Amino acid sequence: MNSISLAIQDLLDDTEYGLELVLLAGGAGVGHRIHSSRIQKPGLALTGYTEHLHPDRVQVLGNTEISYLQQISEQQALIHIQKLCSYPISCFIVTKGLDPPGFLKAEAERAGIPLLVTPHQSSTFISLITKFLEERLLPTTHIHGVLVDVLGVGVLILGKSGIGKSECALDLVIRGHRLVADDVVYVKKKMPAALVGQAAEAIQHHMEIRGLGVINIKNLFGVSSIREKKIIDMVIELVDWDPVQEYDRLGLDDEVYAILDVELPHIKIPVRPGRNLTSIIEVAARNHLLKGMGYHSAREFHEKLLARMEVRPLGNEVE
């Protein structure tokens, strides 16, 4: 179960997604927590069959469910509702502005289960609340780094403080690429395995350059130089040059960097005077695009080299 949760009160307080929910009964339960973004229509649970009931999910009652409760005898309906309310239901939401039966209101109030109503049709509301819950319940983290859109590739630049991450990003922006976030990158995991990065609202569109201070990229270079959010496709880590360290010179070994259990291509770039890091990052992004099309430059070169070694002439050998 996702450790992130929302209170029912958060649904009532929504103004961004247009849920338009009103509390009818069960106000004592507005602190109930929602852990799942999945929605359930109780259906058979209203007939007494609760084998596949998921009480942790939001229970949506549409025209079909309300009509069924109104058509069967009140005594029979009350038995089924009491059984349903014996479970730790997060909340009931009635769609289409329908007026639920009085016994449902009374039982929800007695059990402390919030009973809400929305004017939306069931299909519309389920779409809205699913989007709301998915956004709010996504696993998140924050990373010290810079996120740039390079040729459509989301490049997360990492490295120790002062190594030149922001300067690289600024040079990339000057070359026509787009800044997403500088210094702190907020990352959300979207199912099944996509990571979306964005800037903290307070520092969005801004960048800190040592010796220059904080600059506003949007104002300096225009709206085409920034993005609100971007899927992270690869990680480039800037590291200090170590003369005794053996660095990958062929690119045959594909390393990965894990964020929220999602593995991303990971490249380490040694930093030393004279190296054009911006060009290297651009080429890394282009190479990533090629790999996505099934072309691996290093492997093709390696295979050609092996083939030439196998067919080369043996020379003048003495028998």
UniProtKB/Swiss-Prot annotation:
Broad enzyme group: transferase
Signal peptide: none
Active site residues according to the UniProt entry: H144, K165, D183 (proton acceptor), R249
GO biological process, one term: regulation of carbohydrate metabolic process
Cofactor entry: Mg(2+)
SUPFAM superfamilies per the UniProt record, alphabetical: HprK N-terminal domain-like (SSF75138), PEP carboxykinase-like (SSF53795)
Keyword Magnesium carried by entry: yes
One GO term describing the cellular component: cytosol
Residue ranges of the region described as Important for the catalytic mechanism of dephosphorylation: 270-275
EC number assigned by the record: 2.7.11.-, 2.7.4.-
Pfam families: Hpr_kinase_C (PF07475), Hpr_kinase_N (PF02603)
Residues given in the record as Mg(2+) binding sites: S166, E208
Alphabetic keyword roster: ATP-binding, Kinase, Magnesium, Metal-binding, Multifunctional enzyme, Nucleotide-binding, Serine/threonine-protein kinase, Transferase
Function recorded in the entry: Catalyzes the ATP- as well as the pyrophosphate-dependent phosphorylation of a specific serine residue in HPr, a phosphocarrier protein of the phosphoenolpyruvate-dependent sugar phosphotransferase system (PTS). HprK/P also catalyzes the pyrophosphate-producing, inorganic phosphate-dependent dephosphorylation (phosphorolysis) of seryl-phosphorylated HPr (P-Ser-HPr).
Extra remark: Both phosphorylation and phosphorolysis are carried out by the same active site and suggest a common mechanism for both reactions.
PANTHER family: HPR KINASE_PHOSPHORYLASE, PROTEIN YJDM-RELATED
Full protein name: HPr kinase/phosphorylase
Lineage: Bacteria, Pseudomonadati, Thermodesulfobacteriota, Desulfuromonadia, Geobacterales
